[in-house]
Design a protein with these regions (language model features):
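Helix-loop-beta segment of a Rossmann-like dinucleotide-binding subdomain
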Residues: 133-143, 193-201, 246-256
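NAD(P)-dependent Rossmann-like dehydrogenase/reductase catalytic/cofactor-binding core
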Residues: 2, 214-217, 221-308
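NAD(P)+-binding Rossmann beta1-loop-alpha1 motif at the extreme N-terminus of oxidoreductases
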Residues: 2-57
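Rossmann-like NAD(P)(H) cofactor-binding subdomain of soluble oxidoreductases
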Residues: 20, 38, 42-43, 50-133
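Rossmann-fold dinucleotide-binding core
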Residues: 101-177
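Hydrophobic anchor at the start of a short beta-strand
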Residues: 8, 31, 98, 118, ...
Length: 308
């Protein structure tokens, strides 16, 4: 499949979604976006770290394009995925792979049972959006892999995506990679909300970080996953140092009165812990702290009825 062009639909056109749309379009793929409020096209304006710009009108919400798509990529918040995807499944060919790119875990369970090949992915690319302009501020790695047996034959997609937006790596055990990203999210996201700080200032709270990691390691071991606390701690601190000047996505959501992904990050961890009879007191406390912040938003409850 390397060098092959594909017909692709990308559901969710935020900063990361537009980054993928621009990269795949430049590579010659036949792309379209898919928006909650349907429109025929979308102006995509992406600026990369080298100063290059992409400015094109990309078609959107064409049902015929969706029905003949060879790949569907979902770049939404975790809590938006099932609302967005489930109504569309009947228009996506059953042999078309669907790649989920989002923070957190638990969306797969909401989509079950599903016949389509499902791929999960996590990315370390950093991008933000202001006034509909996307700024790709840091290159990263996107890790993808099969979630169900139907998706195992689709490993060549990693090469196609790598050509568009490197680096992309295929993993035979993507769940381990997803758990690794979950650990970072469980530490960095809620703690930055609690202390209203940039990521780098979390080095002042080593005891809390250690307790969170201890609780997560216990859950991972109960799930049958290998853990090494010292290695995971080093991994977490490397992220804190490398993103020291950044505000976490969860803190940005709270500051902008938006719903967070806490239910699919710390909430998912707590749910798995309960299934194994484990307690997670520090993660419980942080979960309720973020949920209480959400409930303070004037418009939060009115937004709950909205689909993605």
């Amino acid at each position: 499949m390397k060098g092959e062009t594909m017909k692709i639909t990308l559901i969710g056109c935020g900063a990361i979604g537009k980054l993928w749309l621009s990269s795949l379009t430049l590579q010659g793929h036949e792309t379209q976006g898919w928006l909650r409020v349907a429109q025929s096209d979308l102006f995509v304006d992406v600026n990369d770290p080298s100063g290059r710009t992409f400015r094109e009108l990309i078609p959107c919400n064409n049902i015929n394009h969706l029905q003949t798509s060879e790949l569907v990529i979902v770049c939404l918040k975790a809590w938006q995925v099932s609302d967005a995807l489930l109504p569309l499944l009947g228009n996506i060919p059953e042999n078309t792979p669907i790649l989920l790119l989002h923070n957190g875990m638990g969306t797969i369970e909401e989509l079950a049972p599903i016949r389509h090949p499902i791929l999960a992915g996590v990315t370390t690319h950093a991008a933000w959006q202001k006034n509909n302009q996307v700024f790709h501020v840091a290159h990263g790695i996107t890790h993808i892999g099969a979630i169900n047996s139907q998706a195992q034959a689709y490993y060549p997609i990693a090469d196609i995506l790598h050509e568009a937006l490197p680096d992309v790596a295929w993993h035979n055990h993507i769940q381990t990679t997803c758990w690794r990203k979950l650990i970072a999210n469980c530490v960095i996201n809620p703690l930055t909300v609690e202390y209203d700080c940039k990521n780098g200032l979390l080095i002042d709270y080593p005891k809390q970080i250690s307790q969170i990691i201890d609780e997560i390691c216990a859950v991972m071991e109960a799930e049958g996953l290998h853990t090494d606390k010292s290695e995971l701690t080093e991994y977490i601190y490397s992220i804190i140092y490398n993103t020291s000047a950044n505000y976490s996505s969860m803190l940005q959501d709270v500051r902008n009165n938006r719903r967070t992904e806490i239910d699919y990050i710390t909430g998912f961890l707590i749910k798995q812990a309960r299934a194994h009879g484990l307690s997670t007191p520090e993660n419980d406390r942080l979960y309720h702290l973020v949920k209480n912040r959400e409930q303070q938003y004037d418009d939060f409850r009115s937004n709950l009825h909205r689909s993605w």
